[in-house]
Protein backbone atom coordinates (compact mmCIF):
# COMPACT_ATOMS: atom_id res chain seq x y z
CA UNK A 1 0.00 0.00 0.00
CA UNK A 2 2.85 2.39 0.78
CA UNK A 3 4.41 1.81 -2.64
CA UNK A 4 1.11 2.52 -4.40
CA UNK A 5 0.55 5.63 -2.29
CA UNK A 6 4.03 6.96 -3.09
CA UNK A 7 3.49 6.27 -6.79
CA UNK A 8 0.23 8.22 -6.72
CA UNK A 9 1.54 11.11 -4.62
CA UNK A 10 4.69 11.48 -6.74
CA UNK A 11 2.42 12.45 -9.62
CA UNK A 12 1.40 15.58 -7.69
CA UNK A 13 4.89 17.11 -7.92
CA UNK A 14 3.61 19.73 -10.39
CA UNK A 15 1.29 21.11 -7.70
CA UNK A 16 4.24 22.36 -5.61
CA UNK A 17 6.60 25.12 -6.60
CA UNK A 18 9.56 23.83 -4.58
CA UNK A 19 10.99 20.38 -3.94
CA UNK A 20 11.20 20.91 -0.19
CA UNK A 21 7.54 21.91 -0.07
CA UNK A 22 6.63 18.75 -1.95
CA UNK A 23 8.67 16.55 0.40
CA UNK A 24 7.12 18.20 3.45
CA UNK A 25 3.61 17.64 2.08
CA UNK A 26 4.47 14.04 1.22
CA UNK A 27 5.67 13.37 4.77
CA UNK A 28 2.46 14.82 6.22
CA UNK A 29 0.33 12.81 3.80
CA UNK A 30 2.10 9.59 4.76
CA UNK A 31 1.64 10.45 8.43
CA UNK A 32 -2.09 10.94 7.90
CA UNK A 33 -2.37 7.25 7.03
CA UNK A 34 -0.97 6.08 10.37
CA UNK A 35 -1.84 8.95 12.73
CA UNK A 36 -4.08 8.09 15.66
CA UNK A 37 -6.90 10.26 16.94
CA UNK A 38 -7.71 13.53 15.21
CA UNK A 39 -5.74 14.06 12.00
CA UNK A 40 -4.53 17.57 12.83
CA UNK A 41 -1.22 19.04 11.68
CA UNK A 42 0.27 18.50 15.12
CA UNK A 43 -0.98 14.91 15.13
CA UNK A 44 0.61 14.22 11.75
CA UNK A 45 3.88 15.79 12.90
CA UNK A 46 3.94 13.54 15.95
CA UNK A 47 3.20 10.49 13.79
CA UNK A 48 6.26 11.30 11.66
CA UNK A 49 8.52 11.88 14.70
CA UNK A 50 8.76 15.64 14.08
CA UNK A 51 7.27 16.75 17.38
CA UNK A 52 10.61 18.11 18.62
CA UNK A 53 11.42 20.25 15.57
CA UNK A 54 10.09 23.63 14.48
CA UNK A 55 6.46 23.30 13.37
CA UNK A 56 6.19 26.66 11.61
CA UNK A 57 7.14 25.31 8.16
CA UNK A 58 4.43 22.64 8.33
CA UNK A 59 1.76 25.21 9.23
CA UNK A 60 2.95 27.63 6.52
CA UNK A 61 2.43 24.85 3.97
CA UNK A 62 -1.31 25.44 4.22
CA UNK A 63 -1.10 29.25 3.99
CA UNK A 64 -1.05 31.66 1.05
CA UNK A 65 -1.73 29.01 -1.62
CA UNK A 66 1.65 27.31 -1.45
CA UNK A 67 0.36 24.52 -3.68
CA UNK A 68 -2.06 24.23 -6.59
CA UNK A 69 -5.23 22.55 -5.36
CA UNK A 70 -6.43 21.56 -8.85
CA UNK A 71 -3.07 19.99 -9.75
CA UNK A 72 -3.08 18.13 -6.43
CA UNK A 73 -6.31 16.29 -7.28
CA UNK A 74 -5.51 15.82 -10.99
CA UNK A 75 -3.70 12.44 -10.62
CA UNK A 76 -6.61 11.06 -8.58
CA UNK A 77 -9.11 12.16 -11.21
CA UNK A 78 -7.04 10.66 -14.04
CA UNK A 79 -6.66 7.37 -12.17
CA UNK A 80 -10.42 7.12 -11.70
CA UNK A 81 -10.96 7.75 -15.42
CA UNK A 82 -8.43 5.06 -16.33
CA UNK A 83 -10.35 2.50 -14.28
CA UNK A 84 -13.63 3.22 -16.07
CA UNK A 85 -14.71 1.51 -19.26
CA UNK A 86 -14.62 3.70 -22.40
CA UNK A 87 -18.43 3.74 -22.59
CA UNK A 88 -18.99 4.42 -18.89
CA UNK A 89 -19.91 7.94 -17.73
CA UNK A 90 -18.15 9.60 -14.83
CA UNK A 91 -20.52 9.72 -11.87
CA UNK A 92 -19.54 12.32 -9.28
CA UNK A 93 -21.32 13.54 -6.13
CA UNK A 94 -21.17 17.14 -4.91
CA UNK A 95 -22.13 18.36 -1.45
CA UNK A 96 -20.94 20.75 1.23
CA UNK A 97 -19.36 19.51 4.45
CA UNK A 98 -18.75 21.16 7.82
CA UNK A 99 -15.48 20.96 9.75
CA UNK A 100 -15.85 22.03 13.35
CA UNK A 101 -13.35 24.52 14.78
CA UNK A 102 -12.69 26.04 18.19
CA UNK A 103 -10.73 29.19 17.41
CA UNK A 104 -12.82 32.30 16.86
CA UNK A 105 -10.15 33.89 14.64
CA UNK A 106 -9.74 31.02 12.18
CA UNK A 107 -10.40 32.35 8.67
CA UNK A 108 -13.78 31.46 7.23
CA UNK A 109 -15.31 30.18 10.45
CA UNK A 110 -18.82 31.00 11.55
CA UNK A 111 -21.96 29.63 13.10
CA UNK A 112 -23.39 26.90 10.89
CA UNK A 113 -26.45 24.72 11.17
CA UNK A 114 -25.46 21.32 12.55
CA UNK A 115 -26.44 18.62 10.01
CA UNK A 116 -26.17 15.97 12.74
CA UNK A 117 -28.51 17.77 15.12
CA UNK A 118 -32.00 16.50 15.99
CA UNK A 119 -34.75 17.15 13.48
CA UNK A 120 -37.03 18.89 16.00
CA UNK A 121 -34.64 21.79 16.74
CA UNK A 122 -31.94 23.80 14.99
CA UNK A 123 -28.48 23.30 16.47
CA UNK A 124 -25.58 25.55 15.52
CA UNK A 125 -21.87 24.74 15.62
CA UNK A 126 -18.75 26.83 14.98
CA UNK A 127 -16.81 25.63 11.96
CA UNK A 128 -15.68 26.01 8.36
CA UNK A 129 -17.69 25.08 5.28
CA UNK A 130 -16.11 23.19 2.40
CA UNK A 131 -17.44 21.97 -0.92
CA UNK A 132 -16.38 18.45 -1.89
CA UNK A 133 -16.74 16.52 -5.14
CA UNK A 134 -16.21 12.76 -5.06
CA UNK A 135 -16.10 10.42 -8.05
CA UNK A 136 -17.91 7.08 -7.87
CA UNK A 137 -15.44 4.26 -8.57
CA UNK A 138 -17.40 1.06 -9.35
CA UNK A 139 -16.29 -2.15 -7.68
CA UNK A 140 -17.15 -4.16 -10.81
CA UNK A 141 -16.01 -3.18 -14.32
CA UNK A 142 -19.46 -3.73 -15.83
CA UNK A 143 -23.01 -4.13 -14.62
CA UNK A 144 -24.70 -2.83 -11.47
CA UNK A 145 -22.84 -2.98 -8.19
CA UNK A 146 -21.37 -1.02 -5.35
CA UNK A 147 -19.14 2.02 -5.80
CA UNK A 148 -16.64 3.85 -3.64
CA UNK A 149 -16.56 7.63 -3.43
CA UNK A 150 -13.08 9.00 -4.20
CA UNK A 151 -12.57 12.74 -3.48
CA UNK A 152 -11.40 14.63 -6.56
CA UNK A 153 -11.95 18.22 -5.43
CA UNK A 154 -12.21 20.17 -2.18
CA UNK A 155 -12.62 23.93 -1.92
CA UNK A 156 -13.16 26.25 1.02
CA UNK A 157 -16.57 27.93 0.76
CA UNK A 158 -16.91 30.59 3.48
CA UNK A 159 -19.76 33.07 3.69
CA UNK A 160 -19.34 36.79 3.17
CA UNK A 161 -18.28 38.70 6.29
CA UNK A 162 -21.08 40.97 7.46
CA UNK A 163 -19.93 44.60 7.93
CA UNK A 164 -20.74 46.85 10.86
CA UNK A 165 -24.11 48.58 11.04
CA UNK A 166 -22.52 52.01 10.58
CA UNK A 167 -20.35 50.92 7.65
CA UNK A 168 -20.47 53.08 4.48
CA UNK A 169 -23.00 52.31 1.77
CA UNK A 170 -20.24 51.15 -0.57
CA UNK A 171 -19.18 48.51 1.95
CA UNK A 172 -22.73 47.22 2.26
CA UNK A 173 -23.08 47.16 -1.53
CA UNK A 174 -19.93 45.07 -1.82
CA UNK A 175 -21.23 42.80 0.93
CA UNK A 176 -24.46 42.17 -1.00
CA UNK A 177 -22.44 41.34 -4.10
CA UNK A 178 -20.23 38.92 -2.17
CA UNK A 179 -23.30 37.30 -0.67
CA UNK A 180 -24.45 36.25 -4.13
CA UNK A 181 -21.05 35.14 -5.42
CA UNK A 182 -20.11 33.22 -2.26
CA UNK A 183 -23.36 31.28 -1.92
CA UNK A 184 -22.76 27.55 -1.76
CA UNK A 185 -24.87 27.09 -4.90
CA UNK A 186 -22.77 29.65 -6.80
CA UNK A 187 -19.55 27.98 -5.65
CA UNK A 188 -20.97 24.60 -6.68
CA UNK A 189 -21.86 25.88 -10.14
CA UNK A 190 -18.32 27.17 -10.58
CA UNK A 191 -16.71 23.91 -9.46
CA UNK A 192 -19.02 21.90 -11.70
CA UNK A 193 -17.99 23.98 -14.71
CA UNK A 194 -14.33 23.65 -13.71
CA UNK A 195 -14.62 19.86 -13.48
CA UNK A 196 -16.23 19.66 -16.91
CA UNK A 197 -13.46 21.86 -18.32
CA UNK A 198 -10.77 19.61 -16.85
CA UNK A 199 -12.45 16.52 -18.24
CA UNK A 200 -12.61 18.07 -21.71
CA UNK A 201 -8.87 18.70 -21.51
CA UNK A 202 -8.04 15.02 -21.00
CA UNK A 203 -8.15 12.29 -23.64
CA UNK A 204 -9.96 9.84 -21.37
CA UNK A 205 -12.62 12.36 -20.33
CA UNK A 206 -13.22 14.58 -23.34
CA UNK A 207 -16.26 12.73 -24.72
CA UNK A 208 -17.26 11.06 -21.45
CA UNK A 209 -20.63 12.13 -20.00
CA UNK A 210 -20.64 13.54 -16.47
CA UNK A 211 -23.50 12.56 -14.16
CA UNK A 212 -23.69 14.71 -11.03
CA UNK A 213 -26.19 13.94 -8.23
CA UNK A 214 -26.57 16.92 -5.88
CA UNK A 215 -28.43 17.75 -2.68
CA UNK A 216 -31.38 20.09 -2.36
CA UNK A 217 -29.13 23.09 -1.71
CA UNK A 218 -27.89 22.86 -5.31
CA UNK A 219 -31.25 22.14 -6.96
CA UNK A 220 -31.88 25.73 -8.01
CA UNK A 221 -31.45 28.05 -10.96
CA UNK A 222 -27.94 29.07 -9.94
CA UNK A 223 -26.70 25.54 -10.69
CA UNK A 224 -29.09 24.13 -13.28
CA UNK A 225 -29.09 27.17 -15.56
CA UNK A 226 -25.29 27.09 -15.65
CA UNK A 227 -24.98 23.35 -16.29
CA UNK A 228 -22.14 22.71 -18.78
CA UNK A 229 -22.68 20.60 -21.91
CA UNK A 230 -22.46 16.80 -21.80
CA UNK A 231 -23.45 16.94 -18.13
CA UNK A 232 -26.49 15.42 -16.43
CA UNK A 233 -27.59 16.91 -13.10
CA UNK A 234 -29.77 14.91 -10.70
CA UNK A 235 -31.08 17.03 -7.84
CA UNK A 236 -33.07 16.20 -4.73
CA UNK A 237 -36.06 18.45 -4.10
CA UNK A 238 -38.81 18.76 -1.53
CA UNK A 239 -42.04 16.94 -2.27
CA UNK A 240 -43.96 20.24 -2.30
CA UNK A 241 -41.54 21.99 -4.67
CA UNK A 242 -42.98 23.82 -7.66
CA UNK A 243 -41.31 23.30 -11.03
CA UNK A 244 -41.51 25.84 -13.85
CA UNK A 245 -40.28 25.77 -17.42
CA UNK A 246 -37.05 27.67 -18.07
CA UNK A 247 -38.75 29.45 -20.97
Give residue ranges: language-model regions:
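Conserved, well-structured functional cores that handle cations and Mg-NTP chemistry
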Residues: 1-247
